[in-house]
């Protein structure tokens, strides 16, 4: 039923506009796609396409196309529904400042700090992985291209300076982070898509292979599930994204709609690009080439160089550097946002047990988290 108000006619309560207490025109204005929406789509894609993307075709080739297809049919819808549920849970929370506070609102402070700690541990592991990767890889490339005589990573201060710069960029605010990430993420996405397209001319239907026995098919599909899921997983950015929308929007319905829309767009782009990329390589190289690539520990880029004639080797060298550095940097940004939010939630949960919330200096807490993140990343190097 529509209700009249001084703002216009409020839409039926069964519609999103009605639940937000808005007319249809107000709802359309509130949910307009803007630069913030673009930024979160970019950050989500950047988080999903990590450095490991170049090894996905090898894993798919080893297991076979039928196994990957079954794994995709199971894994991708399940992950989509889980991420959708995750967003809805966060968006509905009365207090949406960080993941532990959301859990505290549903289950109490003790569960909030327990599940928040588990979430924190997951992000700490990724902080270790990407801090180490970006330090070692960047130093290796500088040495390979003759910029430095030795490896800068041998000095502990190189890693410290690098992590300080990355944390400073990540902490400057969404707009700067979105601007820096956009070019890198679009480059990664285009490289992955281009690699898939470059293989189309070498497709052979016999690389599809025969359908394996049902038991073996299911077993291998389950084994392949982690690779399938992590190929387009970006749950680390969902919590910071929902919190950002909740802080910007007065209406929970608007914040939820925008977060779900950003997730849907990112998921759709990732699914189409990554799925095509993996299938294209499998149809081009087949199982035997995948086994050789696995034994030699080479990536999809090196495989592409073997198939592409002419200046393939030179092209691969440049693209591999760009893809690897951009993948690690944008993934670090996404992980840091989640890490900062998780750490803040745990710290605030503990402090609120000791003192009134209004006496807590949140700016001081955030600065402390920055220092902690730098020291944590540095300790992993």
Please state what every model-predicted region is.
Residues 1-58, 80-84:
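Membrane-interface "cap" regions at the ends of multi-pass membrane proteins
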Residues 29-30, 132-160, 206-219:
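Inter-helical loop and helix-membrane interface segments of multi-pass membrane transporters/permeases
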Residues 32, 37-39, 152-161, 254-255, ...:
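Loop-to-transmembrane helix boundary motifs in multi-pass membrane proteins
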Residues 35-54, 119-123, 195-203, 211-281, ...:
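Hydrophobic, membrane-embedded alpha-helices of multi-pass small-molecule transporters
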Residues 57-88, 100, 111:
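Extracellular loop-to-transmembrane helix junctions
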Residues 81-90, 96-102, 106, 110-149, ...:
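Hydrophobic transmembrane alpha-helices that form the core helical bundles
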Residues 97-109, 270-328:
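TM-loop-TM module centered on a large, flexible mid-protein loop between adjacent transmembrane helices
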Residues 134, 138, 156, 160-199:
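Membrane-interface loop-to-helix entry segments
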């Amino acid at each position: 039923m529509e209700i009249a108000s001084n703002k216009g006619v409020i839409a039926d309560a069964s519609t999103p506009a009605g639940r937000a207490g808005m007319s249809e025109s107000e709802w359309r204005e509130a949910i307009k796609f803007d630069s913030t929406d673009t930024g979160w789509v970019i950050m989500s894609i950047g988080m999903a396409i990590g450095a490991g993307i170049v090894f996905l075709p090898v894993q798919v080739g080893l297991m076979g196309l039928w196994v990957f297809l079954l794994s995709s049919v199971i894994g991708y819808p399940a992950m989509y529904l889980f991420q959708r549920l995750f967003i809805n849970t966060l968006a509905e929370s009365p207090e949406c400042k960080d993941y532990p506070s959301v859990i505290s609102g549903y289950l109490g402070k003790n569960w909030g700090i327990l599940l928040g700690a588990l979430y924190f541990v997951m992000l700490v592991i990724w902080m270790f992985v990407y801090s180490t990767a970006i330090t070692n890889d960047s130093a290796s490339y500088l040495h390979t291209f003759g910029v430095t005589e030795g490896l800068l990573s041998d000095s502990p201060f190189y890693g410290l300076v690098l992590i300080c710069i990355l944390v400073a960029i990540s902490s400057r605010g969404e707009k700067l982070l979105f601007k820096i990430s956009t070019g890198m993420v679009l480059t990664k996405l285009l490289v992955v898509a281009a690699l898939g397209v470059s293989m189309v001319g070498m497709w052979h239907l016999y690389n599809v292979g025969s359908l394996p026995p049902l038991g073996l098919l299911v077993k291998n599909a389950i084994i392949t599930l982690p690779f399938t899921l992590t190929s387009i997983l970006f749950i680390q950015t969902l919590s910071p994204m929902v919190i950002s929308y909740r802080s910007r929007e007065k209406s929970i319905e608007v914040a939820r709609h925008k977060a779900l829309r950003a997730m849907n767009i990112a998921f759709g782009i990732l699914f189409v690009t990554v799925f095509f990329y993996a299938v294209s390589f499998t149809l081009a190289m087949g199982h035997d080439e995948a086994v050789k690539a696995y034994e030699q520990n080479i990536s999809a880029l090196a495989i592409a160089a073997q198939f592409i004639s002419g200046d393939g080797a030179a092209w691969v060298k440049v693209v591999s550097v760009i893809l690897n550095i951009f993948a690690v940097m944008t993934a670090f940004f996404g992980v840091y946002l989640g890490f900062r939010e998780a750490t803040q939630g745990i710290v605030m949960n503990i402090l609120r047990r000791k003192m009134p919330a209004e006496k807590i200096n949140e700016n001081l807490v955030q600065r402390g988290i920055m220092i902690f993140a730098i020291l944590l990343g540095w300790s992993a190097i």
